[in-house]
Amino acid sequence: MTRKHIEVVAAIIQKGNAILATQRGYGDLKDGWEFPGGKVEPGEAHDEALIREIKEELQADINVGERLITVNYNGYEKFDLTMHCYMCTLTEDSHVTLLEHEAAKWLTKESLYSVDWLPADIEAVDALYKHL
């Protein structure tokens, strides 16, 4: 039997020297911390998917920058994951409103590992730590 494969994009939203982490409020991975984002729809470019997902989840508008890392993670029980992580910033007048997450924190480089990141996000956190 072929395992389900999901392709997602994640926004590493930077504001000053802080990065946004969000805590999932739903599903099997509830309560884990992640970079916000979601599934890429068929025919959708990564930047389009990021802009759409962040608007849906956080009611925020973002500028999508460089791709930091693509993570291939096969450790979840029900699916394999490819996650494309992009450096992003909020647009000038935008702010974050939690619609799907339980909580959010702005983390500095020093506090990046202070939350319980979901397993698939850890490789991206490690890459981000080196990047900052």
Regions found by a protein language model. Give the residues of each.
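Nudix hydrolase/Nudix homology domain
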Residues: 28-33, 98-132
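Residues at secondary-structure transition points
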Residues: 40-45, 49, 77, 99-102, ...
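Short secondary-structure boundary/capping segments
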Residues: 3, 11, 25, 32, ...
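The catalytic Nudix box helix
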Residues: 35-68, 108
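Active-site-adjacent beta-strand/loop module that shapes the phosphate/pyrophosphate-binding cleft
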Residues: 61, 71-95, 105, 109
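Conserved N-terminal beta-strand and adjoining loop/helix that marks the start
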Residues: 1-19, 39
